[in-house]
Structures are given as C-alpha cells and as structure tokens.
UniProtKB/Swiss-Prot annotation:
Its cofactor is Mg(2+); Mn(2+); Fe(2+); Ni(2+). Homodimer, forms a heterotetramer with a Cas1 homodimer. This is CRISPR-associated endonuclease Cas2. Optimum pH is 7-10. Binds 1 Mg(2+) per homodimer, shared between the Asp-8 pair; divalent cations support activity in decreasing order, Mg(2+) >> Mn(2+) > Fe(2+) > Ni(2+) > Ca(2+). One of its GO terms (molecular function) is RNA endonuclease activity. It comes from Halalkalibacterium halodurans (strain ATCC BAA-125 / DSM 18197 / FERM 7344 / JCM 9153 / C-125) (Bacillus halodurans).
Length: 96
C-alpha cells in the first residue's frame, strides 16, 4: 500500500534539529522523499506498524507533528503530480 508521511518538527532547539534528521532518515529507509518533510512509502501493514513505532519514538509529541495518509494499493489514480521534480514510480526497479 502507498502511505504518505508528512511531518513538522520544531527545530528551534538543538534537540529539534537532531529529531528532524532522525525522522527524515527513518522515512528514507521506507520510501522516497517527494518534498521537504513529505515521503511516499510503499509498505505492507507490518512495515507500516514498524515505521509508525519508530517515528513516534523519535518525535516530541508536545512540539512536533506527524501525519500518515493511507492511499492503499490502488493509489496510481489518486496521485497527480504537476511541476518540477518528476514523479518516480516507487514500484519500478532501482538501478544504481
């Protein structure tokens, strides 16, 4: 299923900057950054549970915000991209 992860981490303190880097790194382990603080991730339910647990352990719920949108398996008709940074098909093979 495709999930969209968005987050807002307060970075006015040193701890916030560190949390921001850790949240971004955790999201990169599961998906592709599509904008600042926005990731598209193709995950199954077990991976989503693991990702949620990891992210909630990293953020400060008093200062930070995390949103997870489940777009499901039939997401291709629900996502439209306009403008710079062409879309990447997350299900295509990656060639390095």
């Amino acid at each position: 299923m495709l999930v969209l992860i968005t987050y807002d981490v307060q970075t006015s303190s040193m701890g916030g900057t560190k949390r921001l880097r850790k949240v971004a790194k955790a999201c990169q382990n599961y998906g592709q950054r599509v904008q600042n603080s926005v990731f598209e991730c193709i995950v199954d339910s077990t991976q989503l549970t693991s990702l949620k647990l990891e992210l909630t352990s990293l953020i400060d719920e008093e200062k930070d915000s995390l949103r997870i949108y489940r777009l499901g398996n039939n997401y291709k008709t629900k996502v439209e991209h306009i403008g710079a940074k062409p879309s990447i098909d997350l299900e295509d093979p990656l060639i390095f």
